[in-house]
Amino acid sequence: MIRKLTMIQAITEAMDQKLAEDSRVMLLGEDVGVNGGVFRATEDLIHKYGANRVVDTPLSEAGIIGAAIGMAMNGLIPIVEIQFLAFIYPGFEQIVSHAARMRYRTRGQYH
């Protein structure tokens, strides 16, 4: 039988499952910790996995995505929450200008 979930419930459950199955998975974003995210998608995850894996960040989408790129380069598996679509654009610069070119900028040290 297929369970009926809201989109937020499905997202929360997926993040919970990934955090549970791999200690390298980290969740970061604005208000994802104690506040549980703007839509409560991360509610209670900080209590379950701790502040070292569910990380509240400053209000800086470029900083959040840049940090996630660095984490991924060093073996972690970051999940980033960007609260609203319009806020993704400042962070997208990190993906286009840094993550996409990292292999070539490091002579293949990072893929």
Language model features by range: what are they?
Residues M1-H111:
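Thiamine diphosphate
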